[in-house]
UniProtKB/Swiss-Prot annotation:
The keyword Nucleus applies. It comes from Oryza sativa subsp. japonica. Residues 221-235, 291-326 have a biased composition (Basic and acidic residues). Signal peptide: none annotated. Belongs to the EME1/MMS4 family. This is Crossover junction endonuclease EME1. Its EC number is 3.1.22.-. Forms a heterodimer with MUS81. GO terms for cellular component: Holliday junction resolvase complex; nucleus. It is found in: Nucleus.
């Protein structure tokens, strides 16, 4: 299908010019765009000769013609080059647009006589910058170099850009198009070359000028620039003007200014379809964020991290404080428990008993007589607690123990001591005895306090009786109202014989009364925690040893001697005689438990032991009575049995 387009007529020069160019052309792999019949052979020395000076050519006018843009099948001829050298060519179609991929390969300029530099031949000389010719350069991914017809440039003798492609068929196979489009006449089909894809091979990567640079500029701008060139008028005859050799650098890729070329709408659509960068935004533009926004985001992240770190530090601090408080609380609780345990032990041992007992004194005791002042002073001096109250029975004193709450285990916090004391003046006691109401008084107290011990304390009783008797004796005449001595001794004996747990105490003055009551308070406080006394505990410390004994200290140091002395009827001398024969209780018990001996022999076992006299003689014997006592006590089955020794034997 033919279409009208503004194109440039390409007029070939004489063959002489082509011959001149052929002399400086590259090896046969690079076909010159001319009507020359033959080129220099690969092995010819002219193939690598330096380029001749640029020929002077006149400018030719071009006119607008109508071209058929239907592609014509190109003529393919075998390349006159060895199989190991592949030709790197550039499409020779003037004013044509070859769609290519901007991502995968670069587009070289459609210059008729230009070739791409080859990495196989290293010519470090700078490229020719002759006016009117295209100087080969490294073409970037985004560069589209238009072709300037009518001008030939000396070709550089360099190998193909992509080694490994040995034929135009292979080059076309790896190119991005199915077939190059030629807008020239039929006789120029012989000079049609094929575009090879600039793939990334090790040979291409060797030279930096053949490296394909990535697209760093906006692809949309290039498409817009390409569209803007369509509006230019190419009908002018001065199309093939001479360009200045000004190198432009585009992201590391060097290209030379070429005349602008318009793209048709179909070419623009083809370019958009072939180029993915036009349809999609560049990744760098898509991922790029404004600097201020990134800074704000970074600052926000830093602030959040800082707040998180501060929050974690604060949480750790709070945890440490809570742990510290818990440890302090546990430590304080343990200290309190230890203190409580210590106080409990003190309480159980009776060390705190005097601080817990309270004496309840009837007000009549404090108000009447001279005992009250001394009694209050005595309690204050000893640090004892007392309380003046009005008791149910006049003149009585009661005691109570205030047990601490932490020591009580299902017990009342206050316990009453089962003891009641009556402080009676001598005249009061004599009136009770004379009137016969003393025993009635005892019965009354017993009914109210049945389990209590009753004690009567009198003050100056005997002195009062003597004074009254003396006064009665000094009277001259007998009076019917004369005072008679009350039977005090008989009343006190009845209290001791007829009633249990009834005591009496006669004091000579107020100081003795105070001392007795204070001492009784101490005893009542500690008696609850005191071990009960037994016969053995009373005599175990050697209290029954006579004062005139010479070996008293020796007996107190030996438990075996103190045990022997505690037996009734065993003197210290007899105990020492037994200890000399049998130094321990076990040695004596072994003999007593011997079954081979009879009971009679065991009873008389110790009777022949000799006692040491005052002068050191051993004339006296222990005797059968003492021997039987020792045997009876040590071999008794009942510990409460009394020792009653029969002199006649067992």
């Amino acid at each position: 299908m033919a279409s009208h387009a503004a194109v440039v007529e390409i007029i070939d020069d004489d063959d002489d010019d082509d011959d001149d160019v052929a002399a400086a052309s590259t090896p046969p792999a690079l076909h010159k765009r001319s009507h020359a019949v033959a080129a220099a052979a690969p092995d010819s020395p002219d193939a690598f000769s330096p380029s001749p000076p640029d020929p002077k050519r006149r400018q030719l006018a071009a006119s607008t013609i109508v071209l058929d843009d239907t592609p014509t099948p190109p003529k393919r001829r075998p390349p006159p080059v060895a199989a190991d050298r592949s030709a790197s060519v550039v499409a020779d179609t003037p004013r044509s647009f070859v769609p290519c991929s901007l991502r995968n390969r670069a587009i070289a300029g459609d210059t008729p006589d230009s070739v791409l530099p080859s990495p196989s031949f290293h010519l470090d000389a700078p490229d020719s910058a002759t006016p009117g010719s295209d100087v080969p350069c490294s073409v970037g991914l985004d560069d589209i170099v238009p072709e300037t017809p009518g001008f030939n440039s000396p070709r550089l003798a360099r190998p193909p850009a992509v080694p490994g492609l040995t034929s135009p068929m292979t080059a076309r196979k790896f190119s991005g198009v199915s077939c190059p489009i030629s807008l020239d006449s039929d006789d120029e089909l012989d000079d049609t070359v094929y575009r090879e894809s600039l793939t990334r091979t090790p040979s291409n990567m060797a030279k930096p000028e053949h490296a394909i640079q990535p697209c760093t500029t906006s692809c949309t701008d290039k498409v817009e620039n390409t569209k803007s060139t369509d509006k230019k008028d190419y009908s002018k005859s001065n199309v093939g003007y001479q360009t200045n050799n000004s190198a432009c650098k585009n992201n590391g890729t060097t290209s030379y200014n070429q005349p602008p070329r318009a793209n048709s709408p179909c070419e623009d659509s083809t370019l958009k379809e072939a180029d993915p960068f036009i349809n999609n935004h560049c990744p760098q533009e898509e991922n790029a964020l404004p600097i201020e926004e990134r800074k704000k985001k970074q600052q926000e992240e830093k602030r959040l991290k800082k707040e998180k770190k501060a929050r974690e530090i604060e949480e750790k601090k709070q945890k440490r404080l809570e742990t510290k408080k818990q440890k302090e609380a546990m430590k304080a609780e343990l200290a309190e428990l230890k203190k409580l345990e210590k106080e409990k032990k003190k309480w159980e041992s009776g060390k705190l008993a005097t601080k817990c007992i309270v004496a309840e004194i009837d007000s009549s005791v404090i108000e009447s007589g001279s005992v009250g002042g001394h009694l209050v002073q005595g309690f204050h001096e000893k640090g004892l607690c007392f309380r003046v109250t009005s008791n149910s029975i006049k003149g009585s004193i009661l005691w109570k123990m205030q047990i601490p709450n932490e020591f009580t285990q299902d017990q009342a916090s206050t316990s009453q001591v089962p003891y009641i004391l009556f402080v009676l003046q001598a005249e009061e006691f004599c009136d009770l005895v004379s009137g016969g109401t003393l025993l009635d008084h005892v019965q009354k107290v017993r009914r109210q306090y049945p389990e209590f011990t009753i004690c009567y304390v009198t003050n100056k009783l005997m002195s009062f009786i003597k004074r009254r008797e003396q006064n009665q004796y000094n009277k001259t005449t007998s009076n019917s109202n004369s005072w008679k001595r009350p039977p005090v001794e008989e009343a006190l004996c009845k209290l001791a014989t007829h009633y249990a747990r009834v005591r009496s105490r006669h004091c000579t003055d107020e100081a003795e009364v105070t001392e007795h009551i204070v001492g009784l308070t101490y005893s009542l406080a500690n008696c609850k925690f005191r071990k009960p006394l037994t016969w053995l505990s009373v005599h175990a410390n050697g209290s029954n040893i006579s004062k005139g004994c010479v070996d008293k200290d020796r007996i107190k140091k030996s438990a075996w001697l103190k045990s022997l002395v505690a037996i009734p009827g065993v003197s210290p001398g007899q105990a020492i005689a037994i200890e000399k024969k049998y130094p321990s209780m076990r040695s004596l018990l072994n003999v007593y438990m011997d079954d081979s001996k009879s009971v009679h022999e065991k009873e008389h076992l110790l009777e022949d032991l000799r006692l040491e006299g005052p002068l050191g003689d051993f004339k006296r014997r222990l005797g059968p009575a003492c021997s039987k006592k020792v045997y009876t006590i040590l071999m008794a089955q009942n510990g409460a049995a009394e020792v009653e020794v029969d002199r006649r034997g067992a």
